Amino acid sequence: MEQKDENSKSKSQIVVAVRPVYPRMLSGDGRPRKFRDDEDETSSQASSAISLEEGNINRRKPKCVYISFVTTLIRRLAPPPGHSGLQHIVETWKEPDSNGAFKFDWRDDISRDIVPKNCHSHNDYWRRVPLYEALAAGCVSIEADVWLTEDKELLVSHSWQSTTKERTLRSLYLDPLTNIFENRNVSAASTDDKQTGMFDSDPNTSTILLIDFKTDGHELWPVVLSQLQPFRDKNWLTYYDGEKLIQGPLTIVGTGNTPFDLVQQNSTDRFIFFDAPLLSLSSSSDGDKYNTTNSYYASTNMKAAIGRIWPHTTHKLSSKQVDTIQSQIKAAEDKGLKSRYWDTPPWPIALRDNVWSTLMDAGVGMLNVDDLVSASRWNWGWCVVAGIALCGNS
């Protein structure tokens, strides 16, 4: 009987040394494995494979939940897509070619449901669709850097090395604007004294074209003037007649190497205005020469205005920096000029949005932006949720 019990015991529990098969097992116990009556080495390894697969699935679950959470947040908080004629142009636009600017079929809903906003499309020509993207977002101000060629053409680019003969001030900006204003001013709603502007929701809003003179200003000046003259002839430009300022649907501002003496020169039909230095407005020697008869903007580099911005945990400007901004903006307001700060921090997103909010709360004249969609259509307070950046560069 004792022998029978022994055989029975050895049958039910046999000790076998098994070498690990799966890499994760190498970190486990190397001692001999014990199998059940109904288990051998093959079935044990299969069981281990299943448990490992289940483990991998379980590890993927938190990642899937996170992705689903972010996707839902973006879907719920993101602004709805636009359906205006301008947005249609953005979706179908093509680069200028040897035939000139991209030509589009006019639609009466060109700016339908677009609310104009005091935002400036910084370095607009870098966008996938210059001009139209900014207008579709509702930004009323657009920037173009121009370079003069030997044959008196105005090329648009941030640097001379990246210029191309097809991308000119005419093909990217002047010809498209001509097309828009011609179609906007064919009805009885517009008269010789009052031309209709860009936006249906506020046709009295003037669109601003900021032209950054990159080469010698005195050489550029007559060429820029001649290309803008057709706009003046059609009464589309804001101008100063020597006594009063008459607003048109398009306002031209010169910056960079724009010569202030030439801006001042035409005292009876001035239609290019100056981008005044914001930090000089409080100066007793220079401040008095800039006003609404010769200038439109008063701009400065953000760092030059308030010093370095440290992206610390609060993502906010110091109280001293806020006070400085408020006094600078007031100095511009007192002269009737629109303040503008360029080179604001693009990142971290929370810092960027707080700087934007601080500037708007202080009454900045024009918000200089690179990210059009975030600036014009998102609720800035929802751009970062639970540490997740839902809106960024667009």
Please give the residue ranges for each predicted region.
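Short, glycine/acidic-enriched loop or turn micro-motifs at the edges of active sites
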Residues: L148
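Glycine-rich phosphate-binding loop at the start of an alpha helix
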Residues: R128
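Non-catalytic positions within long, well-ordered alpha-helices that form the structural scaffold/packing
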Residues: L135-A136, M360
